[in-house]
Regions:
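Cytosolic regulatory regions of ion transport systems
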Residues: 1-98
Length: 98
């Protein structure tokens, strides 16, 4: 089945880490409220907070400064996330410079 072939292709999509900076407007919002899938086509896989890995009940999880969101997204959708001051993309990703 080719339905997921593009989104699962490592040349088209991948996993990135995004840190929530201390001055972010998303602090205090739940993962669901962030609407990352609707806005960027990104899926939150887990959240790292200090020494915890949160991977359950993610829609209700409330974001704090310093949280690291682990996302899966198409590479072309990551550039807009990187341009958003509410997030700091800390993973290198392929950029389309055309």
């Amino acid at each position: 089945m080719d339905v997921f072939s593009e989104v699962l292709s490592p040349t088209a999509a991948g996993i990135i880490e995004v840190v929530v900076p201390p001055d972010s407007n998303v602090i205090g919002q739940s993962i669901k409220e962030l609407a990352l899938r609707q806005s960027y086509g990104a899926t939150v896989l887990a959240v790292f907070r200090i020494d915890q890995v949160i991977d359950r009940d993610l829609p209700e999880f409330v974001v704090q400064a310093g949280d690291t969101l682990v996302l899966h997204a198409r590479w072309k959708n990551i550039a807009p996330i990187a341009e958003n001051k509410d997030f700091a993309v800390v993973t290198d990703f392929p950029r389309d410079d055309t």
